UniProtKB/Swiss-Prot annotation:
Co-factor: note: Binds 1 zinc ion per subunit.
Name of the protein in question: Methionine--tRNA ligase
HAMAP family reported for this sequence: Met_tRNA_synth_type1
Zinc found in the keyword field: yes
Organism annotation: Methanosphaerula palustris (strain ATCC BAA-1556 / DSM 19958 / E1-9c)
Gene: metG
Pfam families per record: Anticodon_3, tRNA-synt_1g, tRNA_bind
EC number(s) given by UniProt: 6.1.1.10
Subcellular location: Cytoplasm
NCBIfam families cross-referenced by the UniProt entry: metG (TIGR00398), metG_C_term (TIGR00399), PRK00133.1 (NF001100)
């Protein structure tokens, strides 16, 4: 048991578009974890809310002819309703544009100002002469100064993943009108992130959670830590103290929402929010893998500087693929939670189960309708549902009901072992392992009833057959309690079929081995329906039609370059001499490449697709005249060219000498 109350949060959904499967990889595991803790007897408060500020909201609102407030309210209600349908039960679901968050954000800024952690500085920022305005964040696109990839104004989302400060991006272009932006000076405010380097190093080594969150962040902290610009030139947002022309950067006020939403919950329940943020409470953040930088570096430093408690655990999910393709709304590789699933009448529990059972939480999840249907049919219908229905149907049909007997010790021991396995998995945030342990118990039950064959035994030894069913009913009770965090609607159905009149969620998992109340049983209902091939084909067709429509629309027209500009790139063939992984990075390899006249060290983001030893001797195409950049503390003097989601290396179709130019 924890010393104090536990606060669990989920990364805030952004209110500029509807819910999709990528969102659910954060919220379903978070909800499962909270339900599990409550079954263990812990006091848990589960908060989240919608993220309403930042340039994407403003840009989307302008495109749709509505105000940012109207757009935010529309999608706030959308997410709130979708989460309820998915069985995700937040104790408080607030808005970052609410009064509580405006107040708490400004209060935190003032604390940091008073402690000397915020200072002003004049910076060069992209300015569009056509639109006559400064271009914060996603109003601008350009080239990442660190790795040379196409990047947004505040983040290199296509390359190294680094946060970008205002004015850092190279060759900036206005996203609204396409005009090449110019740099102009403007006063902004900075948070002294560099002062927290030692604290962050210690914090990241001690915080619980998933390694993908901690290790990436440690790499950034050990590399370099720059002070952080925390204001933007926008009207929409939380006003910076004393400045009506500046708002607080969205990646400051969004996580502050965790505190504000806790305050709102506490006010409604007669509690003090400081129990969680200033006392002995535990704070666990569930986030998407793409926002680890903000939650593992910026946020703990802000909390420490302002005198609040810091997170106890940070749990980051892996990425998502759709049918072996990188998740992409613009290319049609997306599954919408409502349009493609809930609105078709498909049960929320099926999708919850699939998301939790498919793979480890930190690994990439490759969704396909066929794989989804296979798991529903083979695991839920054939294994779990089959055992529960066989047991309850036989107990009812033979007039056995719930007999006034004790379950055999072997059965109780097997349940205890399963509970221990679930506890171990959940403590390590290995949600798949926890689900697997429960499904193993269901498979054990299936094998037990099949081997014991009570339908035969009852003809010759009714007491023995009754004991078998009593044992099976104990397993069914255990399965209801253990599967509730994963499939709450299914667990409630089982609980009711066992004749219980209260809610399964109000019971502890340790009660799984307690005796059942003897009595009659009503006829059971079917838990799961098989997914037929025709249904799967229809779902697959919908996805493929979306992809085809996206291909017809094509991608936005890109700015053309002249042949002279293209000619500035020095493309040559090189041979990989050595390759090794870069510590604390799952994506990057350090390559030594023979370019004929010299050997170059190049960092390449292909570690997920190639073993280092297999690259040695390979011919590759290199951009050889890029400015050197440092990535994860390693200097890179060039770029290896690769194509597609699987990073297929570009190579000549016949042998050529290192240093041969591409023409």
């Amino acid at each position: 048991m924890s010393k104090g109350p536990i606060l669990v949060t989920c990364g805030l959904p952004y209110t500029n578009g509807p819910c999709h499967l990528g969102h659910l990889r954060t919220y379903v595991p978070g909800d499962m974890y909270v339900r599990y803790l409550r079954h263990r007897g812990e006091e848990v408060v589960f908060v989240c809310g919608s993220d309403n500020h930042g340039t994407p909201i403003v840009v989307s609102a302008e495109e749709q002819g509505v105000t940012p407030k109207e757009l935010s309210l529309k999608y706030h209600h959308h997410f709130e309703e979708t989460f309820i349908k998915m069985g995700i039960r937040f104790d408080r679901f607030g808005m970052t544009d609410g009064k509580a968050n405006h107040h708490r954000t400004r209060e935190m800024m003032q604390r940091l100002i008073d402690k000397g952690y915020i200072y002003s500085a004049t910076v060069s920022q992209s300015y569009c002469t056509t639109c006559s305005r400064f271009l914060p964040d996603r109003y601008v696109e350009g080239i990442c100064p660190h790795c040379g990839a196409v990047a947004r104004g505040d983040e290199c989302d296509q390359g190294c993943g680094k946060h970008l400060e205002p004015g850092e991006i190279r060759d900036p272009v206005c996203k609204v009108c396409g005009t090449r932006a110019e740099l102009r000076s403007q006063e902004h405010f900075f948070f002294k992130l560099s002062a927290f380097k030692e604290f962050l190093g210690t914090f990241l080594k001690g915080v619980r959670g998933t390694d993908n969150a901690k290790n990436y962040a440690l790499g950034w902290v050990n590399d370099d830590l720059h002070d952080w610009c925390i204001t933007r030139t926008l009207d929409w947002g939380v006003k910076f103290p004393g400045r009506d022309d500046l708002v607080v950067y969205v990646w400051v006020d969004a996580p502050v929402g965790y505190i504000a939403f806790t305050e709102e919950w506490a006010a409604a329940h007669g509690r003090d929010w400081r129990e969680f943020w200033c006392g002995d409470g535990e704070i666990t953040h569930f986030i998407g893998g793409d926002i680890t930088y903000h939650h593992c570096i910026f946020w703990p430093a802000l909390l420490k500087g302002a005198g609040y408690g810091v997170p106890s655990a940070i749990v980051a999910s892996g990425m998502l693929k759709i049918d072996d393709h990188k998740f992409s709304k613009s290319r049609g590789y997306v599954v919408w939670t409502n349009d493609d699933y809930l609105d078709l009448g498909l049960p929320a529990d099926y999708l919850r189960y699939y998301l939790l059972a498919y793979t480890s939480h930190t690994k990439e999840l490759n969704f396909s309708w066929q794989a989804f249907a296979d798991r529903v049919n083979n695991e839920l219908v054939n294994t779990f549902g089959n055992f529960v229905h066989r047991t309850l149907h036989f107990a009812h049909a033979q007039g056995i009901g719930i007999p006034d007997l004790d379950a055999d010790q072997e059965i109780l021991q097997r349940i205890d072992e399963t509970i221990a396995a679930v506890d171990t998995a959940m403590d390590a945030f290995e949600f798949k392992n926890a689900v697997d342990a429960v499904m193993t118990l269901a498979a054990f039950g299936n094998n037990y009833i099949q081997t014991a064959a009570p339908w035969k035994l009852i003809k010759t030894d009714r007491p023995a057959a009754v004991q078998v069913i009593r044992n099976c009913l104990q397993l069914v009770r255990a399965l209801a309690l253990l599967i509730d965090p994963t499939m709450p609607e299914t667990a409630s159905k089982i609980w009711m079929m066992l004749g219980e009149t209260d809610q399964v969620r109000d019971h502890r998992t340790s009660e799984a081995t307690e005796p059942l109340t003897a009595g009659e049983l009503a006829p059971p209902t079917t838990l799961f329906a098989r997914m037929e091939e025709k249904e799967v084909a229809t779902l697959e067709k919908t996805l493929m039609m979306r992809v085809e429509e996206a291909e017809k629309r094509g991608q936005p027209t890109e700015e053309l370059i002249s042949i002279d500009e293209f000619g500035k790139m020095k493309l040559i063939v090189g041979t990989v001499i050595s390759a090794e992984k870069i510590p604390k990075s799952s994506k990057l390899l350090k390559l030594i490449v023979d370019l004929g006249s010299e050997r170059r060290q190049i960092v390449s983001g292909i570690a997920k697709f190639y073993d280092p030893e297999h690259l040695v001797g390979s011919s590759v195409v290199v951009i050889a005249n890029l400015q050197p950049v440092t990535i994860f503390g390693v200097e890179s003097r060039g770029m290896i060219l690769a194509a597609g989601d699987n990073a297929a290396l570009l190579t000549p179709n016949q042998a050529v000498e290192p240093g041969t130019p591409i023409r």
